[in-house]
Every structure is written in C-alpha cells, then in structure tokens.
Amino acid sequence: MHHSFYGAMVLWVLGYADQAQHWGQDELARAQQGEPTPSLASTHLFAALLAQHRRDVVATRAAAEATIALATTHGFAHRVAQGHIMQGWALAMRGDAATGVAQMAQGWEAVQRTGLQLYRPYVLALLAEAYGQAGQPEAGLPCLAEAVTLVEATEERWWEAEVSRLQGVLLLQRSPADVDQAEACFQQALDVARRQQARALELRAALSLSWLWQQQGQRAEAHALLAPIYGWFTEGFDTADLQEAQALLEALRARDAGGPALPPLP
C-alpha cells in the first residue's frame, strides 16, 4: 500500500522533488477514499516523512497530527510515538525548540521500547537537528554519533550523508574552533551523496560546504562547487533547499561585486 510513498522518497533523494510530491499526494488521496482505516495512520506518517524531506514544516506538522489522531484511535502505539517525533521536529523548526525536543525525545524513547529498527539513524538526525535549533549542539552531537554507529551496524545508509552534514553544522555551532572537523564532515557528506547519486543530499552538503568556504574567503571555490550542482536540478524550485542554494549563489555574486553579506549557514 505504501509503495508509492517509498517511491516518492526515492524520487526526492534522487533530486526530483516535484515528482515525489505528486506521487505522495496521489497515494494519500487514494488512502483517504472511503472510511478511515487503521492503515491510514501509516499513510499520514509517510506523508509527514516526505514533507520533512522537503523541509515543509507546516505540512509535516499537519500530517503528524493526523497520524497521532488516527493511531490513537486504532491503538497503534508505535505510530503514535512516530507521529510525536515528526510533530516535535516541526515544532522545533517553527521556533518552539524546547517543546519540540522534549516531544521528540519522548517519542524516541517510546519507539525504542517497541523494538522497531527501521529509520533509527534518520530519527536521531532529526533529534540532533532539533537540539541544534534549541541551541544545544552538545546534546545533538551524541545523537549523531549513535546514528553513525547504527548506519555501520545495519547498513541503513539512505540518510548517511545528512548525518555527516549535521555533524558539521553542530560542530560549528558548538565552537568555531572546530572548523576543520566541520569541513571534513561536510566533505564526507558530499562524497557519500555523490556515491549514492543522492542529488538532494548532495545539494545540502554543497550548501554547507560552500557557505563555510565563503566564510574563509574562498568565494570562487564556493561558487564553483555549488553552481553546477544547483544547475542540475529541473524541478523543486519552490523547496527550501533550492531556494537557499539560489540565494547563496546570488549572494556570492553580489559579494564579489561589493554587495551585502551572505546568508547564514543552511
């Protein structure tokens, strides 16, 4: 039943955000026909995952709330917990980081009690990102270290590049003195994404690395890295990642011409 959502997430990773969105919307529309069924909670959860991939906070929260409501009605404890994780991430990204982190941590503990193994590196990466939003990189970095261990133990590598990128982000947030280690994390994320042909994650890694390089005065190198990666995309230009890439490229060009300062680290 959820094959379309798995396909949609693959399309997103490969760089086809609009096609992924259409697949996901079609699957959700089919699932919503007729009376609500227990499996509809799972469908809404997958919709939340896809929205989170797109960094669509509003859609993530709405789908997470639908997941929680349906899973509660049908007694799906693990889906309730997963819904709380996604809802917490959305809250953290919207500015209520303390509430979001607490909700995610509670949901993560509940998921662990179920013994569910799938998506654990992904969830830990979301939790680490939320800790970063809360200004607690020192709490987020152990989550990412655990995610790395799980990736190696389970070979669940689809979010590996993002785990490495977020390590770099949180290292810089913790201390500017960690710049060399952060740069290595961004480069590793870029290398992993390229090996996997994960264009969406390659773009994120390039964004972070390009931002760091321009901070170090390497604006030409930053532009040379990011421009061809951005230029590959043919859709998804309304997504946060592509909009940030466009803004960074424009700022790099403007900065070279004596324009305003560059945007903050993605």
What are these regions (language model features)?
Residues 4-266:
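Helix-coil-helix junctions within alpha-helical repeat/solenoid scaffolds
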